[in-house]
Amino acid sequence: MTDLAPKYNPNEVEKGRYQEWLDEDLFKPSGDKKAHPYSIVIPPPNVTGKLHLGHAWDTAIQDTLIRFKRMEGYDTLYLPGMDHAGIATQAKVEAKLRKQGKDRHEMGREAFVKQVWDWKDEYANIIKSQWSKLGLSLDYSRERFTLDKGLSKAVKKVFVQLYNEGLIYRGEYIINWDPTLETALSDIEVIHKDDKGAFYHVKYPFADGSGFVEIATTRPETMFGDTAVAVAPGDPRYKDIVGKELILPLVGRHIPIIEDQHVDPEFGTGLVKITPAHDPNDFQVGNRHNLKRINVMNDDGTMNEEAGKYAGMDRFECREALVKDLKEEGYLIKVEPIVHSVGHSERSGVQVEPRLSKQWFVKMKPLADKVLENQKSEGKVNFVPERFEQTLNHWMENVHDWVISRQLWWGHRIPAWYNKKTGETYVGEEAPKDIENWEQDPDVLDTWFSSALWPFSTMGWPDTDNPDFKRYFPTNALVTGYDIIFFWVSRMIFQSLHFTKERPFKDVVLHGLIRDEQGRKMSKSLGNGIDPMDVIDKYGADALRWFLLNGTAPGQDTRFSYTKMDAAWNFINKIWNVSRFVIMNLPEDAKPAHMPDTSKFDLSDKWIFDRLNHTIGEVTRLFGEYQFGEAGREAYNFIWNDFCDWYIEISKVALNGDDEELKARKQENLIWILDQILRLMHPIMPFVTEKLWLSMPHEGKSIMTASYPVTHKEFENKTADQEMDFLIEVIKAVRNIRMEVNAPMSSEIDIMIKLDDLNNKHILDENVDYVENFLHPKKLEVSADIEAPKLAKTAVIPGAQIFVPLTELVNVDEELAKMEKEAKRLEDEVARCEKKLSNKGFVDHAPEAVVNKEKEKMADYESQLSGVRERIQDLKESK
């Protein structure tokens, strides 16, 4: 009664299924007001490109939670959306246009932004197709974009309110500057890596002609902006020169020697040039000493007029020319090559320039304090694993003001205008009425500013009467990587606390990074990246989802390998095959699964239903604790080991027998267990479970809306569990003996079971059909009083010893000759190892691991030899 193919084919199983779910509106919330709401908003992927394995991991966890809660009866919302990803997307589009010979400045802002929208539309469609291939049960009727009308309204509201509260301000500060993209960068957009560089040791002469001091710098091109040289307070070497003036080499400007706590007297010469416009520490020193700030570079990284004859040169070109001139003029003492960590733009790859710039900032301390205070309350955000709460607290305790303006065209335009005549600043959600007299700030907001509002802006805020906001906010869980706790998670928390007085989500579930098989981070440079869509094409979405959830723990990295994907496919194929077996063994008029009659259970039934009960309880508990790897192991062990390896095999006795009543009971049990397994696994592997569930007798249009399995008190039976475990141990022990003596399962053998006490005898007596079916005994003797035969294979299990006499199974003379030959081989191996290990040259000079390996081999050979000698003795005594 089945149309299931003999072999699991994920492409056939998954083809068209997602569209069927969409057509049935199965992804929308139930709208049942009696049900508890459960919501997750998807961490919005950037529209810069396609999804990677990290996205697949994120969403596999989220969708598993949503499907699990939906089946538990919750009113679930899984809200989709994407991020405009300002700098990242603009950089991609600019690179594309450059290949076409186009420049955004020549195109103009409006035309360029239209090009970016076209890019967004293209990649949004790609991302949605990838979501569908992953099987994500997203409610597309609520899809959001960080630049859509509703979110733009929320962004303006937040900016204006923070400005009016004095928490947003405009000022000059040192920021990370990308000279290629000509914009400020947030810290997360700066990648630090080791570069070859140099310390340039330069003479700074005293203005009174009394000599010079030696200054070491890695960026001599910034010396045009030097306004002081600093020493550590109280440094005895320099106490007599503090207050004196120096002449800036090649420039001629006089600068003072000052004392400041920023200087480390142990580092270098203990003298530091201070360039307030080009170094964050120097900026603070300059503020403390009221030093002038001199910016020496243009936006594109070329030198400005402050650099004199070097004006117009690229900063690195200037460095080379300046060092040459310093040498010719006698100011250069030496050049000391070094390797040092230098910040690079994540997007353009160029060295970032610390640079003074007028930017918009968020005053962070008051907002961070709210987060710290909330984490002490009952309404705190729970972190899984818990240790990452300390990461959040650390960032909030050591927070700096957040630069939120970006010199880009793609993004939320800052809602600030400057009066053309008076220079007055106006900040508002709407433009000034006399707009002709005002000019809007050309900058846009940092992408993180809008994504920080994601959990509540997607629910209709600032309209607090919006039905979605009232029902589904705060959300229940955020699933993301531990690497963006500061850059995104913390910002969502403080914005939500400030504007809604609520935490944005109850739980933050963190995962690590997906690495390659060798443990390396996946990257373009290594060429080890994996496209999740390629994996799905080969193995199916269910196998990828199973891999991503099974065997992983919250907060831990995982390694991708095709060996693991093979194992995932094999497990699903096992479920496919056992489902096919069960369905094929059902009668034509089989009814949907219903609660079985436990009074008719035999031992195997009592055992499997107790194991099923335990598995359902554990998987449900572990899902609730976000321990998906542990839940996967519980499910795997039950399905593969208990159900497939044992209960199915035991059931074949009844299914192939003549007792129609017993056969019917087994069929009812099998359909119930299979139904429960498919429901249990549906949140992780939605496609195959839907296909299999619809192929068996069922009620309802989709397994997605079926109820999740629950435990039943009447299925609990620890006695049956223990008794069946004993029976299984007996069967496994005899099977192992058969393998050791090469006795095929078709042959009959004598089996003697010596019980520690007779309490377990009834287990074997009452299940003699199963014992005979699995063990094929010629003669079975069970007693507490059995003497071990002289020639026998023995196995010891809890509660019993098992003997299989070998007299009729082996030719004693042939076996003896074989064993003596094996003993000679092992003696030779032991002698070889002894000789090698007694060689002092080998022991003293070979790597420790090699020596230890040799010792392990010798111990293994000695152990094998001992067993062979015992076998020889037994054979001799049997003659």
Curated annotation (Swiss-Prot):
GO biological process: valyl-tRNA aminoacylation
Record's keyword terms, sorted: Aminoacyl-tRNA synthetase, ATP-binding, Coiled coil, Cytoplasm, Ligase, Nucleotide-binding, Protein biosynthesis
Binding annotation for ATP: 524
Domain of life: Bacteria
Subcellular location: Cytoplasm
Keyword Acetylation: no
Main localization, broad class: cytoplasm
SUPFAM superfamilies found in the cross-reference section: Anticodon-binding domain of a subclass of class I aminoacyl-tRNA synthetases, Nucleotidylyl transferase, tRNA-binding arm, ValRS/IleRS/LeuRS editing domain
Swiss-Prot/TrEMBL catalytic activity: tRNA(Val) + L-valine + ATP = L-valyl-tRNA(Val) + AMP + diphosphate
Enzyme Commission numbers on file: 6.1.1.9
Entry similarity comment: Belongs to the class-I aminoacyl-tRNA synthetase family. ValS type 1 subfamily.
NCBIfam families the record matches: PRK05729.1, valS
Domain note: ValRS has two distinct active sites: one for aminoacylation and one for editing. The misactivated threonine is translocated from the active site to the editing site. The C-terminal coiled-coil domain is crucial for aminoacylation activity.
Function according to Swiss-Prot or TrEMBL: Catalyzes the attachment of valine to tRNA(Val). As ValRS can inadvertently accommodate and process structurally similar amino acids such as threonine, to avoid such errors, it has a 'posttransfer' editing activity that hydrolyzes mischarged Thr-tRNA(Val) in a tRNA-dependent manner.
PANTHER family named among the record's database cross-references: VALINE--TRNA LIGASE, CHLOROPLASTIC_MITOCHONDRIAL 2 (PTHR11946:SF93), VALYL-TRNA SYNTHETASES (PTHR11946)
Name assigned to this protein: Valine--tRNA ligase
